[in-house]
Amino acid sequence: MNLELSTPLELMGRSAEFQRIVEVLAEDGDLLIAGVPGSGRRTLVRRAALAVGAIILEIDCIRATDGERFVQLMAEAIAQNFDAVKIQDWVASSGKEFFRFQMQENSSIPTGKLTPMRSLNPKQLWQAFELLLGLPQILAASENQRVVIILQSFPHIRSWDRHSLWEATFRREINQQTHVNYVLIATIAETTHHSEETNYPLETVQLAPLARDVVAVWAREILQTVGLTFDSRSKAMQLFLDAVQGHIGDAVAIIRRLQALRRPDGLITEQEVQQAIEELLKDLSITFESLLMLLPGNQVHLLECLATDPTEKPQSREYIQKHGLSRGGSLQGALTGLQHKGLIYGAEQRYQMALPLLALWLRQRLS
């Protein structure tokens, strides 16, 4: 039996955020969704886009390593979601200097592949980008539909878009379109300093960790659908809630393990929860080890400190002296770096670890 983890948003504790996203999209607004990985960012945006009847175009900005790759990914998303014949007509009439479209013959429904021409020089690539930005509006208007462009991990493009030219142009052009909205997904709600931020402000929705009682209700509802329940005579539920710390992604991972460990009576005891956690940490250990190897040494040290000795004031003199942390800019840089990577929350969440299973693994590793 497969565990069905889709659940009403009311049980996920995100109904207010969901409603706000729907309202903004319905009013032709654009959004920034800020939250750590596993907080439900993409699920919320996808469901909200479907709720307003929009076609969804998704671009993973981690894969967009430069402007050319960004154009390629955007072209792919458009080709996968719109009428191939209309795209072919657009290329023939407006885009043949910069794009080519290859119709796929082995499908009952016409599909095709839209790609930028090879070896475009920087000026041509920029022209291709500006031209492509107008295509979703043309296609959406022809079908009388809305489009929501979801840019996952959006801040990654700033590694090559040093002066925010691509970002500013994208936001300006989409803002002027009547059938297209965009949603930026990031770990923190940082602000930029270019003029487009003032001219075209974003509605920001921040996803904090879920409350314990919300996770408890969600977990009970999910487990009941497959005939499982926490043993009320044990501390199984408390152990589960302590482990996930309001992180829906980690909660899902543990619940999947609990299903595999089911007892004949359907009860989940502390033993099953502990076993599920231990097995999960064992499977994740290579991933966590690799993550630490990619982090600067001062970030690793700070992460270990926050996992083993949580504090609301990592910049305090006492905490710095206790753990041998660097003072001043180096410490602040490490805090900011860990926030950008989605590994810790900021001051508003008391600098707690954002990935509870990573925190648990670090504590076991250092004990």
Where in the sequence are the language-model features?
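Winged-helix-like regulatory helical subdomains adjacent to P-loop NTPase cores
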Residues: D250-S326
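P-loop NTPase nucleotide-binding core
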Residues: E23, E27-V148, S153-I157
